[in-house]
UniProtKB/Swiss-Prot annotation:
NDH shuttles electrons from NAD(P)H:plastoquinone, via FMN and iron-sulfur (Fe-S) centers, to quinones in the photosynthetic chain and possibly in a chloroplast respiratory chain. The immediate electron acceptor for the enzyme in this species is believed to be plastoquinone. Couples the redox reaction to proton translocation, and thus conserves the redox energy in a proton gradient. The chain crosses the membrane at residues 9-29, 40-60, 88-108, 125-145, 147-167, 185-205, 225-245, 258-278, 283-303, 327-347, 354-374, 396-416, 425-445, 554-574, 610-630, 726-746. This is NAD(P)H-quinone oxidoreductase subunit 5, chloroplastic. InterPro entries: NADH_UbQ_OxRdtase_chlpt_su5_C, NADHpl_OxRdtase_5_subgr, ND/Mrp_TM, NU5C-like, Proton_antipo_N. It catalyses: a plastoquinone + NADH + (n+1) H(+)(in) = a plastoquinol + NAD(+) + n H(+)(out); a plastoquinone + NADPH + (n+1) H(+)(in) = a plastoquinol + NADP(+) + n H(+)(out). Keywords: Chloroplast, Membrane, NAD, NADP, Plastid, Plastoquinone, Quinone, Thylakoid, Translocase, Transmembrane, Transmembrane helix, Transport. Its EC number is 7.1.1.-. Its main location: plastid. The gene is ndhF. It is a multi-pass membrane protein.
Amino acid sequence: MEHTYQYAYIILFLPLPVTMSIGFGLLFVPTATKNIRRMWAFVSVLLLSMVMGFSVNLAIQQINGSFIYQYLCSWTINNDFSLEFGYLIDPLTSIMSLLISTVGIMVLMYSDNYMSHDQGYLRFFAYMSFFNTSMLGLVTSSNLIQIHIFWELVGMCSYLLIGFWFTRPIAASACQKAFVINRVGDFGLLLGILGFYWITGSLEFRDLFEIVNNLIHNNGVNFRFAILCACLLFLGAVAKSAQFPLHVWLPDAMEGPTPISALIHAATMVAAGIFLVARLRPLFIVIPYIMNLISLIGIITLLLGATLALAQGDIKRSLAYSTVSQLGYIMLALGIGSYRAALFHLITHAYSKALLFLGSGSIIHSMEPVVGYSPDKSQNMVLMGGLKKYVPVTRTTFLLGTLSLCGIPPLACFWSKDEILTDSWLYSPIFAIIAYFTAGLTAFYMFRVYLLTFDGCLRVHFQNYSSTKRSLFCSMSVSVWGREPLKIDNQNLPFLILKRNINNNKVFFFSFFSKGTYKNKIYNNVINRMQYFRTYFQNKYTYMYPHESENTVLFPLLVLVLFTLVVGLIGIPFDQGVIDFDILSKWLTNPFQKNLNHSVDWYEFLTNAIFSVSVSLFGLFIASIFYGSVYSSFQNLDLINFFVKRGPRRILLDQIKNVIYNWSYNRGYIDIFYTKGLTMSIRRLSKLIQFFDRYIIDGITNGIGVASFFIGEGIRYIGGGRISSYLFLYLSYVSIFLIFYQYFDF
């Protein structure tokens, strides 16, 4: 066991050779490096698998003994200052390293196929390996200065990966936005580190916690200054984990490749802020008001993220706001003191969200041959629908990930979210009500994403859909807020309609690849008969329907499904009696504080679970009403209009729906406020400063220079040695003297 801890530093350096090898290879032997480019994916997966094996070994030892190991090496030694670097192995380190390595392996395997067509394939894997290295260095850091170094490296990698397709202006703008917002948090983090070093004289975690605890209890430090430093530290976590009000960068980070989105949202970028708060929890507990601030930011973020996800049309952006909301749950749990539930939900959410993002990438790839390679089309859920027929494996995995995030048992997120909801009720009934309400919203918008993507039939060849109009072929329900009547895009329609007999309700179809005519009374059956046809229109082939992804893409999805099914079982919270299966109570313990007993009895667990699941099921039901194909069928039969007549209540309901839609679609007007209130103000100020600098400061300097030039030229001309010039100057002086003498009458 000692040898395992002594050589734990290799966790940090194992993924690094891939980045260095690709970099030197592209620099010195670019042709050979590009010829064997697919080999680098295998090497990346192999090295990260070694990290996973090492992390599993550490996790087993932590579960059995919770042994803490710290190694320090001094870099600078003098009487006043000592800078030490090392690594810390504790339960938090082991769980984070295992999470990073497992999700990272799945993302790398997925990326080999997903990015195979991209010219930046090698650059992508170099960035990914360095991203994993930076995150592993962050979670193994033994002091605050190391955390800050790797914190900056994580931010740099996210900047490079979000702007991976930097030739696209929107991607370049997104990575700049993420970089600038994280600069705000990083500046606060650095000031907080310097403040606590000034208070304690140490940057090591154990010394820092002990000294601050003693100073607080003995009134040996200014409370206001300590609170300020703690708030600055928390500001870094707010920016990195996309908490309100610095959350606006995360939805725009979707401009990067989809595997990057999965890694950022699951195990790296956003997990860094959660890790920092979890690591510094013993420090935050003893400082007044900080835990209240953390819980307040968490409750605001979880509600805000859920409301902003309600009306998004981009599948990746909807998942991004879902991440914001779920991170709010984790931050709330940390703020109310539920350390175990917070880390538990971090684990379950990571696997579920990685599954959803990789599934969305499979969906996007299947839609690209149909709608084109523009993200505005391939990621637009309005153009999807009915994909369950064409991508059945992706649909099944996406459904399981959706139900997990909705909190449906026995999937992973049910266990962790239910524990957070229960603990929040003990902390504050108001917070609990908001958390339960947001759980219902989560089920609503996540099932909305699923229904818009997989339910109904493919809408790519139709325009201006309406939830109140009937399609010629199937029932559609796209937006709860309503749109214009349905129009058929005749130019892109992949089949030809010869005749429609309304009286006997028959539709006749003709295929260019068939001599016969197909008849059917049921629209869905007609579509099933045509799903493999291809037609030739306007000198181009049009593939009618998407297709399932390749096995190298589906395999990571199936593995993540397995994690989603079983990872929640390690945290069974109720009392098991003689045999204790609660691995989390042994594993997810705070290394610097005594762990609490988290077991509950069966009755309490079932009571809380029934209520939380009922809320989630209600959200699923509402989503199926507004977006399901069954509801649209009722609308087509005018049953809804028969029971719900136009009146004051209906008008009020429409107004409420429009307000919610505008709030969600415009991102809560927060981006608009930042753009007009901050960005435009800064630009106007910069233009004013530029004018002042160019025309005032430079004008004075240049004016003095020009005046000096003309004076010098005049003196040089007069003093050139010509007698005529001297005589002219003399006569001028005499004339001026005589004029003054005559005028003033001296």
